[in-house]
Design a protein with these regions (language model features):
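Active-site-adjacent beta-strand/loop module that shapes the phosphate/pyrophosphate-binding cleft
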Residues: 79-107, 143
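A generic structural micro-feature
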Residues: 8-12, 85-91, 114-119
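Acidic, metal-coordinating catalytic segment for phosphate/diphosphate chemistry
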Residues: 1-19, 23
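Short, P/G- and charge-enriched loop/turn segments at secondary-structure junctions
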Residues: 1-8, 81-85, 110-112
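Nudix hydrolase/Nudix homology domain
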Residues: 35-37, 103-158
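Short, charged/polar surface micro-motifs in flexible loops or helix N-caps
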Residues: 24-26, 34, 45, 74-79, ...
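Conserved Nudix-box catalytic region and its N-terminal flanking loop in Nudix hydrolases
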Residues: 22-61
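A short coil-to-beta-strand element that immediately follows conserved catalytic motifs
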Residues: 65-74
Length: 158
């Protein structure tokens, strides 16, 4: 069971994201439900560590098993979701991933994979393209140039 619950018109999520980089580009995705780019990842399940969750989510979405380099951020986000209109309180752990033992960089600049009933389109976005892209999380548009060496706690209000 995902660690996510709804109270009236608000929703709490505990999730993880994979920061996957190659040559000043970040791997982002979108699907038929979302007009914006976002990072691979998803909700943490009960009795699952964040590390287990990020590896599982990357496997489910990309069919590869990367290694975790290090945790980057614990982001406390407060926002209204563009798709469902709910007000979210989200805790998300962002992990820098090591993809050296995967084929992700050989899949091309844009590629598509299916997960269940959803089709995900993945795209390698140049760092300098993020500032003008419809991309979440917003803080990453600037922070991508200055990745922390230790886990950093932050808050984002929208």
């Amino acid at each position: 069971m995902d660690i996510s619950f709804k109270v009236e018109n608000q929703k709490f999520n505990y999730r993880v994201c994979a920061v996957i980089l190659s040559e000043n580009q970040i791997l982002a995705m979108h699907d038929e439900r979302s007009p914006y780019f976002y990072l691979p990842g998803g909700r943490v399940k009960m009795s699952e560590t964040a590390e287990q969750a990020v590896i599982r989510e990357v496997w489910e979405e990309l069919s590869v098993t990367p290694k975790i380099d290090r945790p980057l951020w614990l982001n406390q986000a407060f926002f209204t979701e563009d798709v469902d209109g709910l007000r979210y309180h989200e805790l998300c752990l962002y992990f820098l991933m090591d993809i050296s033992d995967t084929d992700l960089t050989q899949r091309g600049p844009v590629f598509t994979l299916t997960e269940g009933t959803h089709t995900h389109t993945f795209e390698w976005l140049a760092f300098d393209r993020l500032k003008d892209a419809y991309f979440y999380p917003i803080f990453l548009k600037k922070e991508i140039y200055n990745l922390p060496n230790v886990l950093t706690v932050r808050a984002e209000f929208e």
